[in-house]
Amino acid sequence: MQRSPLERANLFSKLFFSWTKPILKKGYRQHLELSDIYQIPTADSADNLSEKLEREWDRELASKKNPKLINALRRCFFWRFMFYGLLLYLGEVTKAVQPLLLGRIIASYDPDNAHERSIAYYLGIGLCLLFIVRTLLLHPAVFGLHHIGMQMRIALFSLIYKKTLKLSSRVLDKISTGQLVSLLSNNLNKFDEGLALAHFVWIAPLQVMLLMGLLWDLLQASAFCGLAVLVVLVLFQAWLGHRMMKYRDRRAGKINERLVITAEIIENIQSVKAYCWEEAMENMIESLRETELKLTRKAAYMRYFNSSAFFFSGFFVVFLSVLPSMLTKGIVLRKIFTTISFCIVLRMAVTRQFPWAVQMWYDSIGAIYKIQDFLQKEEYKTLEYNLTTTDVVMENVTAFWDEGFGELLVKAKQNDSSRKVSSDDKNLIFSNISLLGPPVLKDISFKIEKGQLLAVAGSTGAGKTSLLMMIMGELEPLEGKIKHSGRISFSPQFSWIMPGTIKENIVFGVSFDEYRYRSVIKACQLEEEISKFAEKDNTVLGEGGITLSGGQRARISLARAVYKDADLYLLDSPFGYLDVLTEKEIFESCVCKLMANKTRILVTSKMEHLKKADKILILHEGSCYFYGAFSELQNLRPDFSSKLMGYDSFDQFSAERRNSILTETLRRFSLDGDAAGSWNETKKQSFKQTGEFGERRKNSILNPLNSIRKFSLVQKAPLQMNCIDETLDEPPERKLSLVPDSEPGEAILPRSNMLNPGPVLRARRRQSVLNLMTRPSIHQGSSLYKKGSASARKMSVAPQSNMSEMDIYSRRLSKDSGLEISEEINEEDLKECFIDDIESTTSVTTWNTYLRYMTIHKKLIFVLMMCLVIFLIEVAASLVGLCLFKDGASRMNSTSNLNHTSTLDWFAVIVTNTSTYYMFYIYVGVADTLLALGFLRGLPLVHSLISVSKILHQKMLHSVLQAPMSTFNTLKTGSILNRFSKDMAILDDLLPLTIFDFIQLLLIVIGAVTVVSALQPYIFLASVPVVIAFVLLRAYFLRTSQQLKQLESEARSPIFTHLITSLKGLWTLRAFGRQTYFEALFHKALNLHTANWFLYLSTLRWFQMRIEMVFVIFFILVTFISILTTGDGEGKVGIVLTLAMNIMGTLQWAVNASIDVDSLMRSVSRVFKFIDMPTEEHRPTHPAKNKDISGVLIIENQHVKREKNWPSGGQMTVQDLTAKYLDGGPAILDNISFSISSGQRVGLLGRTGSGKSTLLFAFLRLLNTEGDIRIDGISWDAVPVQQWRKAFGVIPQKVFIFSGSFRKNLDPYGQWTDQELWKVAEEVGLKSVIEQFPGQLDFVLIDGGYVLSHGHRQLMCLARSVLSKAKILLLDEPSAHLDPITYQVIRKTLKQAFTNCTVILSEHRIEAMLECQRFLVIEENKVRQYESIQKLLNEKSVFKQAISHSDKMKLFPIHRRNSSKRLSRPKITALQEETEEEVQDTRL
């Protein structure tokens, strides 16, 4: 960044913002880069501002029992705030004085006041000076207030972030990520630009009092008639606003529904295409969109009438103000024109400035109190440790994760007089407190000495992770004693990668030791991986390590933990994403050798690990099931395998037990036993969803973290009703959310309290920060080119009879995200608060975009032409009326000099001729007609623009759904979703009304200039250069401002990225003590954004000031042209000066509106880009290499037409297949060929990332491919994409359950009857589950089917495949995250329902391969072997290296008696009781 010219600028340059000229000039001539931005002033640095506010807040906390954040802010910023407020007041006072001078100038042209004609020149000079003074006062004041608002936001940003890093885990469990993001975006954005309005809460009343005093002097009591009109107008606008908010609230729910479905579809686009559901999904979304648009139109009409009421109310205010005076004293032109000027200022103060100021204070005070409450939340308590301790001891520890339990626990401890703390060893000891709810850990005791390895095992939710959190101090024990040295290193279950290089992620701020670093790299098997990167360990990793595979992330996370020199290493399932060979090597070299002298606690379920551990702790439902050595385990606990692997799963419960479990599950999600309204009529069968839907989805839509959640179906804890829900208690303020677009999911969505009518739940489930920290990212398991292709390895979701650990983490069963869904779209700030990915677009919108936008809907051109015609009629009528009135009044003035009385003011002129009154009445009639025409002009325009938005959404949705997968591999998911959320919100809400305002203002200005020029032709000559100056200034500023806005948006992204990253790795940060380092990184991100935002504010003020300076010059010319060229008669000079004075504000408004239109049209440009995306049908398919198959295409096409039941056999031939994820990218599969016979079962083998999933995607034509694949002799070049994919049944890694009923999820096209659906549900084991839900098949699943276990969701996919009656079944690790029982159900179904089908299976488990006849081994992008299992075991292969002796025994039982005799395929009975070894998770 460059040094800012502001530091060496003089007073003149600062006053006129001339120091911004270099950046404006550079932005006009070339594209701006981040290096072109100026450094921020020292006073604006986040370090200084946060330190200042933190000091005052600490002072407030120390001095008072009831601290107030507003007091801390007052001590920091009050005096500067008041100084700029005083400047603003003085600038506004000049507006009230200007009409006085105008009245004197008009009066001087009365023939009776000829002796004052010479004073007119001085009055004109005074009027011009008032404009100059106002310009010099107003702009520095507004800029200063914006600057203070920016500083307040920065200081509060920092304060909130620092507090976030200190919050206790219990508090984090009750605060959603959406709330935190909302605190930093929704609430704090109010300070930036809103602070300039704050002073109008006292300026506007003073101004009204001053204006009413002046009007009283001019019109006496009739002045209050105009004020009464304004009060009525304000009440009318308030009523319109209330009506509009009702429509918007109802519409917000519909927007949520549409965006939920859209987000789910985009996030699962591979599944949508694999199932050929594009048309069904498109119809579903468009149906929701139609309902949404009906409410959008109603809300837009309300806002249109609100805006129009302001524009057209001016005439009635003036007319009713002067009417009583006119009827009693006659028409006095001076009074009329002076009243017009007074009323314009009065109208702005009453209807705009004061309401806006009140709203700003209301919102800001509410935001301050919310931030204050947040800053007073319970903090993470650092336990006191004994550094000389070498052992790790836990004695009789019991702890709770219960939701809403934090405050209860604190109060209980405070009130427990028997609580004692040992002063000897400074360890925490807690006494018994009787509380309801099952503890997550119950009476846990163990002791491990230095250098020992403790293996912690147990089923899902047993309390393994909670045990580690207890040791780290994240979970505070209710009772018991913990003892260790406190020097801890930690590797989380779901690897956390911070943005930075590989080296930075491993060293993580610890002092660098080359030898230790290299040893750790080698032990964690990272040497080969790092050597493949061009930059080696200096390769920069994106947020979450998106460019790495899940295994690579896991190893880097483990290396980070091992590199730190600690006494105790906590390793939470570090091998979850590794293939079995890598896992064995790392366990031996790293855990057993490199860390041999260190105390280690390893969470694992592998038998090999348990055998080598010094001590074993098996947890079951939070209790210690076993503690001791492995040799004791088999003797004392022969049933340990079921506890270890979660064999107590849902499917083993009796029917009565299952029924009670499901009933309890449903009860937790309903306020009462009644059903709520739903998406459609069938949704009445659903449980109560009101108020929960938006909260659940706010953390899943456009999700930068789009997690794979860990649920258990069963939770026995009672529904907590005291969960934090700030949104229920807060005022119904307008909100918006800001999520970084650098995240894979980013956008702002409207949030609604209601998906359907009904009461709001007091305890709405939301995604807690704790949940965010305890589940993987969407990218876990995916590689650089397999973006999102491999799901994270998830824990088994076997339900527990009591609330499990993972249940407690995810007790709200919500999908996660860092996104707050706003209740409605914030009209004022929406366009400012979205970040978008870096675009290589021009700095201004092209004319082609405008032309295409206007011509996409035929009626829009007609409406625009109608607007032009109505405008011409209005201008013509105005000219005729004004001329008649002016001339008539002038003639009467000359003949009525003797008719005035001495009781009137000495310069007043009374017009008593009756014809003049007729002229006035005619003018009133013309004005009423023009008012009606104005309403007629705007309403069709708004309606047509919303219709354009509808058409654009239809076209874009169709294009996206039909786009090839290569498009989705190159685009961020968030970028796509932003088009449907951010840009469609702009097209629906902001753009129509902004275009209307711009056209309305432009026509007003043109009309006023036309009238003034017609009355005084010389003024037209003066207006030409002024118009040219405006156009040039706008073009000059627009190029730079749009680039600065784009840079500012890009700079805003790291702030929220860093927040979410910090939250995800908060436990790691605390374990490593890196809070200060991350605070510094956050301040760096804040400073970067501040530099861009401050420069934008400065250049904006430069432009506004230049616009006003040009107008002041224009007004000076108009004033003196009028004074010098006007003879006797008040009419002409009155009209000219009044219109010229009031053109100023309108013209500035119009220029700003034009800039807003240009900015908003960039959304239209982005939408057009998506509309123009290529479609799959037109994507060329490359022929097989060295093969000319064109000669048989005609025959095959004819065959396809004849064979209606193709494919009939399922025989596949793959020839020279090459597959890539990106055009021009590396080949993931390179020139492979093989064939599969009809009905054959083939297993795919290979290490993680070898290309097994890629091959399945290639079969479905989801990748860029070359070569040929034939099914039953038909080439894929001869069959349309949709028909080709229908030949396959698919069970993907990533289960796709969209928000809809069971029926829709199984049969979105409605092809099957209920009987057929029930038959298939029974066949796959889902019938008993579906029957437990109200409505059964019509029960509505939301949020990815969170009420179902992962196994049940997998069975849904299996049911779809059965219904598809496909001849070829593709299974991509279907058992990766299943409990053993559900896995056996799938095996049974595959065996029975797909007997005659070709099955291609990618698996890690040996058991899953038992039914396969042949195996395809993929290594280094090629097919290495394609043989039977017997041949593979006789040859050197990955399979032979990975398989253990016990695995061979399972595959070949006879081998134990006679190794020379082998079975070609062992017989397996469904749901057989497996032995201890069979239960093991054996992976390849």
From Swiss-Prot:
**EC top class named in words:** isomerase
User: Reaction catalysed by this chain?
Assistant: ATP + H2O + closed Cl(-) channel = ADP + phosphate + open Cl(-) channel; chloride(in) = chloride(out); hydrogencarbonate(in) = hydrogencarbonate(out); ATP + H2O = ADP + phosphate + H(+)
Its GO CC terms are: apical plasma membrane; cell surface; chloride channel complex; cytosol; early endosome; early endosome membrane; endoplasmic reticulum membrane; membrane
Chain segments carrying region Disordered R region: 654-832
Which loops or segments lie on the Extracellular side of the membrane, by the record? 99-122, 217-222, 320-339, 881-922, 1016-1017, 1121-1134
Protein's name according to its UniProt entry? Cystic fibrosis transmembrane conductance regulator
- List the Pfam families: ABC_membrane, ABC_tran, CFTR_R
Q: Gene symbol?
A: CFTR
Q: How would you summarize the oligomeric state and partners of this protein?
A: Monomer; does not require oligomerization for channel activity. May form oligomers in the membrane. Interacts with SLC26A3, SLC26A6 and NHERF1. Interacts with SHANK2. Interacts with MYO6. Interacts (via C-terminus) with GOPC (via PDZ domain); this promotes CFTR internalization and thereby decreases channel activity. Interacts with SLC4A7 through NHERF1. Found in a complex with MYO5B and RAB11A. Interacts with ANO1. Interacts with SLC26A8. Interacts with AHCYL1; the interaction increases CFTR activity. Interacts with CSE1L.
Cytoplasmic topological domain ranges are 1-77, 147-195, 244-298, 359-859, 944-994, 1039-1099, 1156-1484
Q: Which regions span the lipid bilayer?
A: 78-98, 123-146, 196-216, 223-243, 299-319, 340-358, 860-880, 923-943, 995-1015, 1018-1038, 1100-1120, 1135-1155
- Motif PDZ-binding: chain residues: 1482-1484
- Region Disordered, annotated ranges: 1463-1484
Q: Which GO terms describe its biological process?
A: amelogenesis; bicarbonate transport; cellular response to cAMP; cellular response to forskolin; chloride transmembrane transport; cholesterol biosynthetic process; cholesterol transport; establishment of localization in cell
